[in-house]
Amino acid sequence: MFLIENSLIHNLINRQTGISKCLINLQKLILEFAQKKLNLRIVNYYMTPINFPYQQNPDFPNRYISPEKLFFFLQKNYSECISELGTSSLGKPIYKMTLGKGDIKVIAWSQMHGNESNATHAMLDLLAIFKGHPELYEDLFSKISLNFIFMLNPDGSEKWMRRNALDIDMNRDFLKRSSKELKLLLNLIENGNYDYALNLHEQRTIFTTDGKNPATLSFLAPSENFERDLTETRKKTMAVITKMYDRLKNILPNQIARYTDEFYPTSSGDNMTKMGIPTILFEGGHFINDYKRTGTRKFYTIALYEALKAISELNGSTENWENYQNIPQNKETHYDLIYRNVKLNTDFDCILDVAVQYREEILEGDDEISFTPIVVEVGDVSSKKGWEEIDCKGKKFISEKKFPKLDEEVNFKIE
């Protein structure tokens, strides 16, 4: 019997990430033919992201998602598998979608922070993909049962705010349970006997994997205590993340990181891990020249699928958990924009750097977020880099004020 590596077959028939359903089926036929007719044994066959048939849900092209638009879409297209979990502080519905009949029970939620929409997009994109590729759905959801909470914080999501309508950060409210929305989630979790949880978030543009490449995706196996003990629950989480990383690193090289695992005693993921539920934290981050996060959205969607796939395969195993530590850790190295060598209009010689971050907001009547440049640091910023840098040497600083003010909009020009 001859032996052939599955990766060789992938290389023969896969040359792009946007492979179609017909090519996926062709791959399966080639593999079956190799096994049955040519007496070849295929090693390590699985569906890799290389041939994942990604497509964006056409109903949600913008980064901003209106709660009302989401609710209407779910009610119109998925009424048979959604139920109202409860309502928000301002009375907006919060929907739970139930998919699959497998034995492995998974709970996931999106937009606990209202200004983090990538996870909602990822689930909406997966629904569109499953519609066109039912074989992916059937394979996955024969093994797992998923409860997905869409837009846990609809009040904050409507205003594009991190916090809820009462200005509570739900991800720091586990012990007090002051927020109505978090109580709904925790009641479901505490009575649901879940095997895994997916805590889906986004991170700022400041993070990289190596000081150069953006941390487009970061994952975390949260700690249970200040000592960061490697408990069995954490090892199960690490095993899932390791398997995800192994499958994603080739399509997103040098842009996947490991989030810091310091213990946060009031946060959701840390306490759910403490409860014995392996909880995978997702953080969608920056993608070069992509502040609308369209690229991040694509890889977030694939990562969500790969997380569910890994869970279905591991089923509580801690296999290869130790390789989690090989994933590069997030580094805080960048600003959105840095003006270098700015000479101010002062009575004395003053040359400095000005660092800028974009503030995201949804303006009344708009259906997409806007970006406002805000001064976040002034002085020597030589230890940091900018995704965009402007050298102002030999140029004029033009402003009504003599110097830029921290935490205010950029109100100057460089000419």
What are these regions (language model features)?
Residues 82, 96, 148, 197, ...:
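Conserved beta-strand scaffold positions in the cores of enzyme catalytic domains, especially
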Residues 15-16, 35:
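Short Gly/Ser/Thr- and charged-rich N-terminal loops/segments
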Residues 3, 7, 12, 23-26, ...:
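Short hydrophobic targeting helices and cationic amphipathic motifs
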Residues 44-94:
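Short glycine- and acidic-rich boundary segments immediately preceding or forming the N-terminal edge
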Residues 41-64, 192, 220-415:
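C-terminal accessory segments enriched in acidic
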